[in-house]
């Protein structure tokens, strides 16, 4: 039995070693006939960059060898006004969901897909005038360089992650659960609400002219810096809120668990 297992492992290593080797040279594929959408759903092992623009456009950037081998490397479709994006698990070399290795015409196939050793991750660039709802789940990763919107919602779950450089919005609401994470360099908003549960986490620099509301439960944690006219927090379970770098003009901290968490210091004064 041990001998058979060892033989199988050796065959597997040999098969993967004989797969096509990507050169690192990037190529691009544009998804055709993309219908208008106002919501974005990211799943699977998918890296997505949202670029706000005048047109609706989806383009896939990956190693050229990978694009040549796998015609349908990215699945992009609009359902009920929502763009659903998923990518075949190539960033991890298929090893994370390994089921079978096949040989066809001298090529190696893992889980029925041509195996290519990649050096760079697959990235999907999404362009749209305005998206008001983002869903990031599984191992999905969303990056927002800059966006301007009236009302927007973000749902980050499982091991999903959201990274943003600058957001300008009237009202924004974040739902972070599972092992989801949020990292926002600059958030300018009238009202901002954060719901963080399970082991979700957040790191946010905010400029809030209205109310900043934070609801943390389970083992969730979030850290704020910047300014807010009003700050309201509700903390339960082992959740924690750190706002040692948050300046708030309202001297009354509302909500349950009013006492500051360990290491937390609210600085009160006029918000510039």
Range-by-range predicted roles:
Residues 4-13:
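Sec-dependent N-terminal signal peptides
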Residues 15, 19-21, 142, 158, ...:
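Compositionally biased regions
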Residues 18-137, 143-155, 168-175, 190-192, ...:
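Acidic (Asp/Glu) and glycine-rich low-complexity loops/linkers
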Residues 29-30, 124, 142-143, 162, ...:
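Short, flexible, glycine/charge-rich loop motifs used to bind or transfer phosphoryl groups or to couple energy/partner
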Residues 151, 160-196, 200:
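Histidine/lysine/aspartate-rich catalytic loop segments that bind and position anionic ligands
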Residues 182-272:
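Short, surface-exposed interaction patches in beta-rich subdomains
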